[in-house]
UniProtKB/Swiss-Prot annotation:
Binds 1 Mg(2+) ion per subunit. This is 5'-nucleotidase domain-containing protein DDB_G0275467. It comes from Dictyostelium discoideum (Social amoeba). It is an enzyme of class 3 (hydrolase). Its cofactor is Mg(2+).
Amino acid sequence: MLSNKRISLIKVLPIPSNKKNVFKINCSSNTTIITTSSTTTTSGIKSYSTHNRSNNDTHTSKSNTIDQHQQQQPQQHQNNDNKHLFTPTPFQSLVKNVNKPFRNDKDPDYLPTHHSVLNMSLDQLIEMYKNRKVVDLSHVPTLDPQDVFINSELKLEEIDVFGFDYDYTLANYGDQVQHLIYDLAMSHLVDEQKYPMALKEIKYDPTFAIRGLHFDVNHGLLMKLDYLNNIQAGAIYHGRRPLTKEEVIQIYGSMQLKRLYCDSFLKPMSDIFCLPEACLIANTIQYLTDHNLAFEPRIIHEDVTAAVGKVHLGGGLHNKIISDFPLYLNKHPLLGEFLLKLKSHGKKLFLLTNNSYFYANHGMKYLLNDQLNGKYEDWTDVFDVIITKCDKPSFFGKGRPFRMYHPDSDRYDWNEVNHFEPKKVYVGGSLKQFTNVSKWRGRSVMYFGDHLYSDLVEPSQKEGWKTGVIIKELEVEVGIQNSPKYREQLAELLQLEDVIRKCQFFSGEKKELFLEQLKTERYKKRLALKEPFNANFGSLFRTHTNATIFASSLQRHADIYTSKIENLISYPLTASLIPSRNYLPHEFKLN
């Protein structure tokens, strides 16, 4: 029996079958040698005998075992009886059973303590890399871009109440809205805040930014971070100029930012409405830099944010959209069918939006009224509670008292709201008051929105609501991942990274040259995988290796996510949505 002391690491050295099978096990405080004969019982199980050696014998036994193993190594490759010990399979995993122990120049008896080593020479590794074959991925299924993706198990039959935001949830805007926001905010910046008139000549670039970025108000840098606050190399900009890795390290001292610094100076840009804001900040900084005009980054951020806020609150944006719905709103024929399906199964529906009733009413009539199939006269008949001007995220905190609003007279009641009436409109309110008045509580309520922090975090944490996020970009991202070219490039990158891991176990000039070649190739392949999503910042959901802050927050705060709300229509309302197993780095991945 092995020592009952905790074994911190086990290494097994198989010895050819023409000798006694000897397996050397390195333990944290002693060394155990297991010797086995080739005798097999009638049940087919080999019998083992073991004995312990004291720590005084450890060095001797290590040397003898390694030397004996090296002398017999050529025979092992020729002996079919030992095929079960190791069958080399390129690119499958880093750790293999040991056939040739690692040698350290300073200590020839040194055996690495972190994991087993390779059974091949450097020349064999180089040859294997040169002769690598394109991985056949034709049997690997693609993902449905319009599927519902699950973070946490969700039983739809337990949901009695479904709530919805308006912007980018029920209302799916076209790309022209981003151009409109940028132009209106730029006009405010120049006309009201007296920024240089020449800025108006710089137009919105829809290809520049992605959402989920962060702006450093201390240094004036727009960047993409992973969930560990690592800056993605090549995805950090001063104005429209990307910074090199050396420049980033000169500024921050590292590619990883401290949590305290992030909390103090980084401003998140988490929803689609932030895209024109990010572009406007970058264009403004670039213009001021090019013309040698001194500026404070924090002030630029405050002015641009204020200008974008004025666009949303001033009425100009909404009036423009209402004047041309076909240009700015994308109608989806399944939206009405999905909402009617919920109603037919006895579900309660509510609308919770920051927009005015005037704006939401015009949009909902355009989107829904021709999809009600004669079952309802107006979209307001479909929703049990309608709340506008709720002022999220303040709504989820202290909030304000609810007030009933009368659209016909543009008048607000002064009375306390102690129950919700059908076809009536309410403004203001708070999450606590909403729960008390509606009596809808906890996990029987599910709310859908497009903004993780403004829409979903607090209702989930404070009231236990189930949450769903609508991410418009998801269909494009999944479509790119499904493309044969992307999948082939990803497979090549994973192969390459496996070779890099193996190469690092060797030493010498030849190894260094080969490793440098591999790293250069890795850099090129990473760029090739980044550019299809966005040439500047890459994917919304991941950096080269890790999940982005956006994706990590999505996993923590959303039970499900999808590209549009009506994607749920194909799921029975009795379905249990079960997530895929989330593997940890040390776990075996079974596909």
